[in-house]
Amino acid sequence: MAASLVGKKIVFVTGNAKKLEEVVQILGDKFPCTLVAQKIDLPEYQGEPDEISIQKCQEAVRQVQGPVLVEDTCLCFNALGGLPGPYIKWFLEKLKPEGLHQLLAGFEDKSAYALCTFALSTGDPSQPVRLFRGRTSGRIVAPRGCQDFGWDPCFQPDGYEQTYAEMPKAEKNAVSHRFRALLELQEYFGSLAA
C-alpha cells in the first residue's frame, strides 16, 4: 500500500494550521510524501475510535478522489470509563479546558490518556484503510500555559511537571500521542526502504 504513495502528494484532512505544522515538524524532511492540508467537512461519526477513523478516511477518499491522511484524537478520562473519548471536540467546545478539569472534581482518579489515530488510504476505495495509533498517559489538571490549542492546557503527561501547553513545542512533539502515532506511520514507510 505505502509503496504506491512514495513520492506522492497526500491530502491531510485538517483545517487547523497548528495541527499541520505539528505533523510536518514531527515527520521531518525524510518523510517520502508531501502532505497538503485541505479542510473537508466530514460527518462526526459515533462509535469506537478505530471505526470512526476508518469511516472518516473513507468519506475523505470519496470527496478527494486521491490519497488521504485523516487524524482523529481522543481524550479519555479513566474515572469516566473513557469519556469524553472521541467526543472531546464537543466537550471542549462547550466546557473549555477549565470545564474538562472540573468534570473530574468529584473523582479521586484524575488519570487520563490521549489517543491519536491516523488513518491512511491510497485513494483506492477497494484497498483497506491503514491505522496508526499513539497513546500517551497522563492526568487532568487545572489549565496552565497557552490556551490556544485545544485541551493541551489541562493534560499533563506522566513523568512531567508541565502540561502539553507549557512544554516547548519540540519537547511536546517528542512525547505526544500524535508523535507516537506518526512514529508508527514513519516506521511503516521506512519498512518499505529496508
From Swiss-Prot:
HAMAP family: HAM1_NTPase
Cell compartment(s), UniProt: Cytoplasm
Entry GO terms, CC: cytoplasm; cytosol; intracellular membrane-bounded organelle; nucleoplasm
NCBIfam families from the UniProt entry: RdgB/HAM1 family non-canonical purine NTP pyrophosphatase
Disease: Inosine triphosphate pyrophosphohydrolase deficiency: A common inherited condition characterized by the abnormal accumulation of inosine triphosphate in erythrocytes. It might have pharmacogenomic implications and be related to increased drug toxicity of purine analog drugs.
Record protein name field: Inosine triphosphate pyrophosphatase
Reactions performed catalytically: ITP + H2O = IMP + diphosphate + H(+); dITP + H2O = dIMP + diphosphate + H(+); XTP + H2O = XMP + diphosphate + H(+); N(6)-hydroxy-dATP + H2O = N(6)-hydroxy-dAMP + diphosphate + H(+)
Signal peptide region: none
EC number: 3.6.1.66
Effect of residue 32 to T: In ITPAD; complete loss of enzymatic activity at homozygosity; partial loss of activity without ITP accumulation in heterozygous individuals
Tissue expression profile of the protein: Ubiquitous. Highly expressed in heart, liver, sex glands, thyroid and adrenal gland.
Biophysicochemical property: pH dependence: Optimum pH is 10.
Principal location listed in the UniProt entry: cytoplasm
Enzyme class, first EC level, given as a word: hydrolase
Residues passing through the membrane, by range: none
Required cofactor(s): Mg(2+)
GO MF terms held by the record: dITP diphosphatase activity; identical protein binding; ITP diphosphatase activity; metal ion binding; nucleoside triphosphate diphosphatase activity; nucleotide binding; XTP diphosphatase activity
Annotated GO biological process: chromosome organization; deoxyribonucleoside triphosphate catabolic process; ITP catabolic process; nucleoside triphosphate catabolic process
Function: Pyrophosphatase that hydrolyzes the non-canonical purine nucleotides inosine triphosphate (ITP), deoxyinosine triphosphate (dITP) as well as 2'-deoxy-N-6-hydroxylaminopurine triphosphate (dHAPTP) and xanthosine 5'-triphosphate (XTP) to their respective monophosphate derivatives. The enzyme does not distinguish between the deoxy- and ribose forms. Probably excludes non-canonical purines from RNA and DNA precursor pools, thus preventing their incorporation into RNA and DNA and avoiding chromosomal lesions.
Keywords, comma-separated and alphabetical: Acetylation, Cytoplasm, Disease variant, Epilepsy, Hydrolase, Magnesium, Metal-binding, Nucleotide metabolism, Nucleotide-binding
